[in-house]
Structure formats: C-alpha cells, structure tokens
Amino acid sequence: MKKVHVLGAGTMGAGI
C-alpha cells in the first residue's frame, strides 16, 4: 500500500 500512499496522497492518502 506504499504506492497507494504516494498516488493517493493528494486525494485520500491522508488516512493512509
């Protein structure tokens, strides 16, 4: 989920 954190950092990566 590390990649999701980078890609979703601008959207909902705040929770991850």
From Swiss-Prot:
Question: Which domain of life does the protein's organism represent?
Answer: Bacteria
Task: Give the reactions, separated by semicolons, that this protein catalyses.
Answer: (3S)-3-hydroxybutanoyl-CoA + NADP(+) = acetoacetyl-CoA + NADPH + H(+)
Put simply, this protein is called 3-hydroxybutyryl-CoA dehydrogenase
Instruction: Name one process (GO BP) from the record.
Output: butyrate metabolic process
Q: What is the lineage of its organism?
A: Bacteria, Bacillati, Bacillota, Clostridia, Eubacteriales
Q: Which family does it belong to?
A: Belongs to the 3-hydroxyacyl-CoA dehydrogenase family.
Q: Which UniProt keywords apply?
A: Fatty acid metabolism, Lipid metabolism, NADP, Oxidoreductase
EC numbers: 1.1.1.157
Gene name tied to this protein: hbd
Q: Pathway it belongs to? A: Lipid metabolism; butanoate metabolism
Provide any one GO MF term from the record: 3-hydroxybutyryl-CoA dehydrogenase activity
